[in-house]
Amino acid sequence: MNDEIRIIPITTKKGLKTFIQFHYDLYRGHKFAIPFLRFDEMNTLDPKKNPAFEFCEAQYFLAVDSEARIVGRIAGIINHRANEEWNKKQVRFGWFDFVDNVAVSCALLRAVENWGKSKGMNECVGPLGFTDMDREGLLIEGFDRKSTMYINYNYPYYKTHLESCLLYTSPSPRDRG
């Protein structure tokens, strides 16, 4: 695969289904990744069904390679309530899945950063969900153990990709005191 990556914003329900499906395709047959329930994913990501959209907005993106294959996905989320409470201008990224290609992961992160900047945000944090009740975080060890359907599972290369894209070094909320 070459590094010609297009980032496509999701604007339809069909696109949202494709966004959700990518996770299943990426981890198909993986013995430690436990798939999320599709209807839970759809209910969480659908603005008409998730009450968090009363104070959040989101944009979903897919990465497509030069052969029109989907090679990654990411959600950009702005939680206006949290930003107001913490006096921040943060865009969150979540639902971050990608093939092992740094051009893909960095292009997806840039898409969220740019979307956030267009909405007045000045900091990108994640992986996070709409609220602290959603799955969040990144697996950095324990790749040889089964996950649960409530914990993000990711391939070991995710950490290296985030470090390469210069976003992994942000302190976590726990480290901020």
Predicted regions and their residues:
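Single conserved hydrophobic/aromatic residue that forms the stacking wall/gate
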Residues: 168-177
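Conserved beta-strand in the GNAT
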Residues: 62, 69-78
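Short amphipathic alpha-helix that is part of the acyltransferase structural core
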Residues: 2-48
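A short helix-loop-beta-strand connector motif used in the catalytic cores of GNAT acetyltransferases and
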Residues: 47-62
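Acyl-donor binding region in acyl/amide transferases
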Residues: 83-166
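Flexible loop/turn segments at secondary-structure boundaries
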Residues: 16, 70, 80-83, 132-134
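Alpha-helical subdomain
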Residues: 49, 77-81
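Aromatic/hydrophobic pocket-lining residues that form π-stacking "cages" and hydrophobic walls in ligand
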Residues: 19, 112, 169
